[in-house]
Amino acid sequence: MNSRRTFLAASGVTALSAQRAVGANDRVRIGIIGPGARGQEILKEALSIPGVELAMATDIYTARLQEVQAISPGVKTAMDYRRLLDEKDIDAVLIATPQHLHCEHFVASLDAGKHVYQEKTMAFTVDHAKRMRVAFQKHPKQKVQIGHQSCSFGMAKDAAEFVAGDKLGKVTMINANMFRNTPTGKPQWSRPVKPDMNPENVLWKSFLGEAPNRDFDANRYINWRFFWDYSGGNVYENMCHQLSFWYKTMKLQIPQAVTMRGGIYLWKDGREVPDTMNVTMEHPEELLFSWNSGFGNDHLGATEAVLGTHGTVYKDGRGVRLLPQKVNNPSYTEQTGASTAPRNAHMLNFIDAIRKDEAINCPFDVGFRVSIACRMAVDSYRTGKTLRWDAKKEEVTS
């Protein structure tokens, strides 16, 4: 996309210096639902953009509201997110709540007339995805950005150029990895239960949402990523990012069949989600997307390889490269992408969409397709079956 942001990155002009002169009409007042660890990160990205003001923050845990005061002293706060949606002068809402609550907060925010930045994974279930789509279609003038930040990376532009035309020939597979390691005795995602995490300081019923009712459990609250009632595990935390990048770049549809296998091989700490896994997704484009992930070794890191008869596009943390298949393209030479983007490019794109109707980098449709693929993977693992997508009925079958 030949956007203002791409021009700035290519010309070496920073987003900050380019936007210093912000008029009153460019002011964007935001609210945030869920300023936890990730929520505070995206909030800081938003506030780094001139003319963006935090009007209100809401969270079901009192300590989070105290933490947000350190970011924006004096900001209005509440534990009930509906108080935020009642504020008529709030233009946009950042949603960074646990995954099982996304649908509730997304639909309510759009119905309240707000633009929405929705953290990933967009939808927790197929039903949630459909309900969110109804709300999205009902409010076509409101901007929705799904929080797959890699869609705004500089390498997104390079990857789109590398896969365009017939450079890769027939693409039959994408092989992706996401591996991490942590010091012995420090399990991935594990967070300590603090003394103030009690029913007086946490709105437990609001946390549960549509999840099964149960008595207050501070561990389930703070370590919600461990439990299927609230989380899709690593599939929803990391596979979604790698899917979204290529689902957008290559316009891939929802997979017609998904198989996930794995287990809890490392940490027997009460978690329900696996720490080691393999997902195979068969797409209607005659393309197999394979994703391997684990938390016990970081040698393979986070990488993706798009495999075509004429070439390979290889992506890692350093950038993206086009590698020729000499057997079919003996004259081709390796190409390395050089496009860059500011750290807050995804949030900047969202704000520019509100201000100037700029195209959204990760639109709702990408989030929808990714959400369905992720849910199919999780349910395949939990049932031990290969699951299939009926595109006409929009239903998952086995």
Q: Which residues does each PLM region occupy?
A:
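Short, conserved SAM-binding/catalytic segment
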Residues: 68-75, 135-137
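Contiguous beta-strand/loop segments that form the cofactor/metal-binding neighborhood of enzyme cores
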Residues: 157-158, 170, 175-323, 328-365, ...
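N-terminal Rossmann-like dinucleotide-binding module
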Residues: 10-72, 150-153, 163, 246
